[in-house]
Design a protein with these regions (language model features):
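Conserved segment of the thioredoxin-like fold in thiol-based oxidoreductases
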Residues: 286-328, 334-341
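Conserved redox-active cysteine motifs that mediate thiol-disulfide chemistry
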Residues: 266-283
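A short beta-strand-turn-helix
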Residues: 235-262
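Short, acidic, Ser/Thr-enriched surface-loop or helix-capping motifs
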Residues: 56, 238-239, 347-348
């Protein structure tokens, strides 16, 4: 899933008891020449703040200092054509860092947050290899206009495995910055009920943080449009049947009231996962439109030209609405607390949300069950 809105990530600083404590970073680096300068930086929101530097000697470097917080840090070094980096947590204690520039990997440990971080990396390494291999197969198959249905199913299974590992990692480290950061960077992968469960676990350590309050507000809003709740109406600019956009608008209620079941689909032209879902939506629309199924797609594209061209290129011959500018407080995406796309809501004739984020063949299966019982 592709994020389109961001929480101001982790403003919290974990206060350590008894004032400042010392840290020592012992680094070993392979693939860097002696004399290379390595820099220790604190990670801010979209920026790095340098706090120290060291010189590589005999393949090693050291940083020493004091800290009263646990913070996200990055060790950087100049590779000539780009900047290399090693992400870690700066906290009290002895921190061990191993960097292999040529092979492109890092190993960190020695302190609680860094041990937790490395443990998570170890768990998902083989999973990442499987994902990369499957993405290559999908790319080749799509290029030859082949059928990727089985590959998409396998990708879904890999995503489920990743979520399970990530979920356990958050719960196991709920009292540490690593666990909090994992949630803040990955909450869009989970359903609102799951996020609320994480927040309850994290509240004792992080409940007073601004980002925690923001995510809580977002999650509560998402719960208001979750399974079993009534849909929320909105009005948005509509693309006419000739592919023109003339500032005319339509309401979601216009379609919910006229059809037996409606799929509300948030997407964008630049979102590859969204584009990958279109063939499945098209197949379901073709099969069930005559029975009372309608699709209402809402684009979160910033530019209307990109939206209109994508609709034409992908043959999306159902209702097309535009979310409008990101700063519209009354937009559809705001009302539905959309933090990632694609996001879909299946709404029945009574206006009740009966399905969320149905992927690939799940949509057609849900429609088959729905009409079978009607």
């Amino acid at each position: 899933m592709k994020r389109i809105f961001f929480v101001a990530l982790i403003s919290v600083l974990l206060a350590a008891c008894g004032g400042k404590d010392t840290y020592k970073i012992k680094g070993t680096v392979e693939g860097l020449e002696d004399g290379t300068v390595v820099t220790l930086n604190l990670m801010g929101y979209n920026s790095l703040a340098e706090i120290d530097s060291a010189i590589v000697k005999n393949g090693k470097f050291t940083f020493k200092g004091e800290t009263d917080t646990a913070e996200v840090a990055v060790i950087t070094f100049d590779l000539g054509d780009n900047i290399g980096g090693c992400e870690m947590y700066l906290e009290r204690g002895d921190i061990d860092v191993l960097i292999n520039v040529d092979k492109g990997f890092q190993r960190i440990g020695g302190t609680p947050n860094n041990n937790a971080f490395q443990g998570f990396v170890n768990e998902i390494e083989s999973l990442n290899d499987e994902v990369q291999e499957l993405e290559d197969k999908i790319r080749i198959t799509l290029a030859s206009q082949g059928d990727c249905t089985d590959y998409y199913k396998q990708m879904g299974e890999l995503q489920d495995r990743y979520k399970k590992i990530l979920s356990q990692n958050i719960y196991d480290n709920a009292g540490m910055l690593h666990g909090y950061r994992q949630l803040m960077e990955n909450y869009t992968l989970f359903e609102p009920e799951e996020v609320m469960g994480f927040l309850e676990e994290l509240a004792p350590a992080f409940g007073g943080d601004l980002a925690f309050a923001q995510l809580t507000a977002i999650t509560n809003a998402q719960l208001s449009v979750s399974l079993g709740h009534p849909y929320v109406d909105f009005e948005a600019p509509i693309l006419n049947k000739k592919g023109g956009y003339y500032e005319t608008t339509a309401k979601l209620s216009d379609y919910v009231s006229k059809n037996k079941i409606v799929l509300l689909d948030f997407w964008a032209s630049w979102c590859t996962p969204c584009i990958n879902e279109i063939p499945f939506i098209k197949a379901a629309y073709k099969k069930y439109k005559s029975k009372g199924f309608e699709v209402v797609s809402v684009s979160v594209d910033e530019e209307t030209d990109e939206w209109i061209n994508a609709v034409k290129d992908n043959g999306m011959n159902w209702v097309q609405l535009w979310n409008g500018d990101d700063d519209m407080d009354n937009s559809a995406a705001v009302k539905y607390s959309i933090s990632a796309i694609p996001s879909t809501f299946l709404i029945d004739a009574d206006g009740t949300i009966i399905g969320l984020n149905l992927r690939e063949t799940e949509l057609e299966e849900a429609l088959e069950d729905y009409f079978k019982n009607k």
